[in-house]
Each structure stands twice: as C-alpha cells, then as structure tokens.
C-alpha cells in the first residue's frame, strides 16, 4: 500500500487543515464542514490517480474522442454524522460510486455519562 501524506507537499489542503485547527474558525460550523468536504474532494481526486482505467471511444459533436474511464467499482463508506461532509466530498468526485453508511451510538452505564458499557 502506498501512503500519500498530503501535508508533506505544498498544496491548498494545508490551508484548509490550518483553518480547521484554528480555535476561532472551528466556531463557524458551516465553514468547518465546507473544509472537510473540500478535503474529501481533494483526497478523492488524488485516489483517482491510482485507479485502473480503460480507453473508450466517446462520440462528440466534432467526432470521436478517446477517453480513459476508470474500471474499478467504488463503494464509499462512512460513519454517520462526523463523516458525512467528508463522504459528500468523495461523492462529488466519484459520482458513480455506491454508498455505505455505519451508524453507532454510545451506551452509557451510569447517570454521569462517563462509563461506556
């Protein structure tokens, strides 16, 4: 498996991460979610470079063009709530992919909600 650490390279994603880590920026939930979505889009684009592709002919108004289409079947899975903006970013790139969702909750065993059981 190849690991691509995006923070090791100069790219716009570093700004999005810095904004998300900023204490004041985190208070604006809309901007925070939008940056999670943007990061999902960027990461999906980077992943798309590693997929398998095949050449296909596409008829255009000007003739026939050869285009490389991905052949991998993709399913995007996420854990509900926190992962949804990230998931949406991936769907913006992999719009023909399947979807999977996982839902979970914490069951507390005491009134103070400090013990999980």
Predicted regions: what they are:
Residues 1-117:
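PRPP-associated nucleotide enzymes
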């Amino acid at each position: 498996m190849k690991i691509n650490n995006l923070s090791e390279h100069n790219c716009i994603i570093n700004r999005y991460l810095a904004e998300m880590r900023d204490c004041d920026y985190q208070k604006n939930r809309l901007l925070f979610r939008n940056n999670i979505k943007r990061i999902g889009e960027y990461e999906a684009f980077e992943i798309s470079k590693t997929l398998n592709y095949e050449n296909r002919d596409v008829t255009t108004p000007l003739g026939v063009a050869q285009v490389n289409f991905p052949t991998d079947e993709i399913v995007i899975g996420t854990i509900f709530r926190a992962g949804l903006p990230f998931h949406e970013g991936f769907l913006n790139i992999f719009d023909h992919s399947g979807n999977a969702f996982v839902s979970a909750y914490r069951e507390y065993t005491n009134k103070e909600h400090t013990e999980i059981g």
